[in-house]
């Protein structure tokens, strides 16, 4: 993240402006290619979530796209239809824009692949992927890892939003 690099440069006495300029250029180019009439041209939950999370949209656009993101999840039966990168941002975005209830319903959903589904099938740690019981070529898939941290964004959500334990700022603040 170029804005984080700018912050680190400032903290270490280096020039932050090259990073800030790069961030502005990235945002400008992203918007020129992917934003039309205030809407993201790619209509997938990962694209929406990441564009909102990274500040690529203006606030009014982000609010409208967060509502669209929420509706996609509701329409999909309260299930995540994204991969790792979408999972990284979706908890923060939906909570920030007032859709924590949708997240809760999605996380606790036992009917579709996800966190609740895994727990309802005996998992007490995070599997490598949620589709651990999908049959491929007549055989069940094998979950290689039953303690896969990369899907643990839900843990951060529990601490930061449900329990209210939040990081005060970047670094050691």
Functional labels for PLM-detected ranges:
Residues 1-173:
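Active-site core of glycosidic bond-cleaving carbohydrate-active enzymes
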């Amino acid at each position: 993240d170029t804005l984080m690099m700018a912050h680190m440069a400032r903290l270490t006495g280096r020039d932050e402006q090259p990073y800030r300029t790069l961030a502005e250029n990235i945002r400008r180019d992203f918007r020129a290619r992917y934003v039309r009439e205030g809407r993201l041209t790619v209509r997938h939950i990962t694209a929406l979530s990441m564009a909102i999370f990274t500040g690529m949209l203006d606030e009014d656009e982000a609010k409208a796209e967060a509502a669209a993101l929420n509706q996609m999840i509701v329409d999909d039966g309260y299930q995540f239809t994204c991969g790792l990168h979408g999972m990284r941002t979706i908890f923060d975005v939906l909570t920030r824009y007032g859709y924590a209830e949708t997240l809760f319903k999605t996380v606790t959903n036992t009917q579709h692949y996800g966190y609740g589904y895994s727990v309802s099938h005996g998992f007490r740690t995070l599997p490598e992927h949620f589709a651990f019981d999908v049959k491929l070529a007549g055989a069940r898939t094998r979950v290689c890892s039953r303690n896969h941290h990369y899907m643990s964004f839900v843990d951060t959500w529990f601490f930061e939003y449900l329990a209210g334990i939040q990081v005060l700022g970047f670094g050691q603040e």
